[in-house]
C-alpha cells in the first residue's frame, strides 16, 4: 500500500515514461524485450574483447528467445503481460544496431507488422549508429511509429568510460545524440549511478 501511494505521488512530480505513454495512447503500453541475435563490437574484437565490465548478458531478453522468430518472441512476451494490450518492440540484447541495414530493416519490419505494436525501442552503443541506421529509424518514425533510440552512455566521464571498458568516449555519445535529434528521433540515455571515478 505504501509503495503504491509513493509512486502515485511521484507521478504528480515527474513525467514518468509509462504514464506518458498511457496519456498519449489512452491505455497502458508495455515494452516487450526481443533478442535479435546481435553481437557486440566490444565482445567480438571489432572494438574490443570481453565486453564492458558491467555487462550481464543474463539480464537481457531470454537467451532461448534468440532461436525464435521476432513474431514468436513478441507473442511469447505479450502472453506474459496481462495489463497491456499495446506494445513497444524493444530490441535490447547486445548491440541492436550491429548488423547490416537490410538485416535491421527486416527485423524491425517483422516487429512493427505484428498486431498492437505501436513502436520500436532500439538499444545500442553510441559508436554503432551510422547515418544509415538513423535514416532507417526515421522511416519508422515517419510512418507514425513511436521510435526510441536507447543509447548506453553509462557515464559522461571519459576516465570512467575507459575504466569500465566501453571503447568510446563522451564526445561520441554527444555526436550520436545530436545526429538523432537533428532527425527528430527520441533518445533515451542509459546511465549507471555510482560507478567508480
Can you describe what each PLM-predicted range is?
Residues 5-88:
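N-terminal [4Fe-4S]-dependent radical SAM core
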Residues 101-109, 130-141, 161:
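Distinct, well-ordered alpha-helical segments
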Residues 158, 180-197:
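Conserved strand-turn element in the central/C-terminal portion of the radical SAM core barrel
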Residues 114-120, 186-189:
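Short, surface-exposed connector motifs at secondary-structure boundaries
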Residues 57-73, 77, 81-101, 116-129, ...:
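Core AdoMet radical
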Residues 174-180:
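Basic, amphipathic alpha-helical patches used to engage nucleic acids or provide basic targeting signals
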Residues 82, 109-115, 137-146, 181-182:
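Acidic (Asp/Glu)-rich catalytic clusters
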Amino acid at each position: 500500500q505504501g509503495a503504491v501511494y509513493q509512486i502515485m505521488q511521484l507521478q504528480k512530480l515527474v513525467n514518468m515514461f509509462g504514464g506518458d505513454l498511457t496519456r498519449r495512447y489512452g491505455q497502458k503500453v508495455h515494452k516487450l524485450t526481443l533478442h535479435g541475435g546481435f553481437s557486440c563490437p566490444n565482445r567480438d574484437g571489432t572494438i574490443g574483447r570481453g565486453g564492458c565490465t558491467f555487462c550481464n548478458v543474463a539480464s537481457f531478453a531470454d537467451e532461448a528467445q534468440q532461436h525464435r522468430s521476432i513474431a514468436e518472441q513478441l507473442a511469447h512476451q505479450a502472453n506474459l503481460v496481462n495489463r497491456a494490450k499495446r506494445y513497444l518492440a524493444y530490441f535490447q540484447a547486445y548491440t541492436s544496431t550491429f548488423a547490416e541495414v537490410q538485416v535491421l530493416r527486416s527485423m524491425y519490419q517483422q516487429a512493427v507488422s505484428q498486431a498492437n505494436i505501436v513502436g520500436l525501442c532500439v538499444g545500442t552503443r553510441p559508436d554503432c549508429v551510422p547515418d544509415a541506421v538513423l535514416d532507417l529509424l526515421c522511416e519508422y518514425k515517419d510512418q507514425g511509429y513511436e521510435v526510441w533510440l536507447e543509447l548506453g552512455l553509462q557515464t559522461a566521464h571519459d576516465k570512467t568510460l575507459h575504466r569500465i571498458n566501453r571503447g568510446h568516449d563522451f564526445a561520441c555519445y554527444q555526436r550520436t545524440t545530436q545526429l538523432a535529434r537533428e532527425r527528430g528521433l527520441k533518445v533515451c540515455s542509459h546511465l549507471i549511478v555510482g560507478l567508480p571515478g
